[in-house]
Amino acid sequence: MFLVIGDSYDERGSLRQVPHRLSLAMVDDGWILRNTLVWHKLNAKPENGKIKRWGTSYEFIFFFTLSTNYYFNMDKVRVPYLTEFSSGAPRHHKTDEKMNMGQQTNLHHPLGRVPRDFIGDDIVQTTLNNSDKFVPDKNLEHSATFPEKLIKPFILGTSIEGDTILDPFLGSGTTAKVSLDNGRKCVGYEISPVFVDTSFERCGQDMIQERVKVM
């Protein structure tokens, strides 16, 4: 399970520590916290210029599992290397060589390196979306929208075609669209009729009636 959650401030201007409190509560309840990813928003929402603190440009993404036996396909989320060569004495050597002149190199994977837990420029360069820019959809007016490319690696890395993806806060339908575009099904819950309509519009009537359930 991937959980994207931001923080908020109390009346004193202190962070409520919502993400940290929630993650601790879930671990206490039996969930296994695999990663705490940091989503760096390249186009963060502008803040009041009168605030007496730094502006916020990130949210936490928690990766939870319920057991030690879970599906994860690293090859779907690898990040291509920036160069075909790595530096090392006594001379430069190809990254796909295991040994060169007695010096051990990293055992580089042909599909790329393991992604980092800081998501910003990385997500632009994954093997899934080399040519796509990491920017939010500004045409959708929703308080908690996120880019399709943010969640695409999560879906492809932790599910296979034909699996059903659950989004209990469907919103504008980003999860549903990415799921459908990549051969998955989707079940979503949304209390706002406006955003249910938006989800239908984004996914297409034929696709959503067959492969998406909105409740």
Regions found by a protein language model. Give the residues of each.
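Core catalytic lobe of class I
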Residues: 1-203
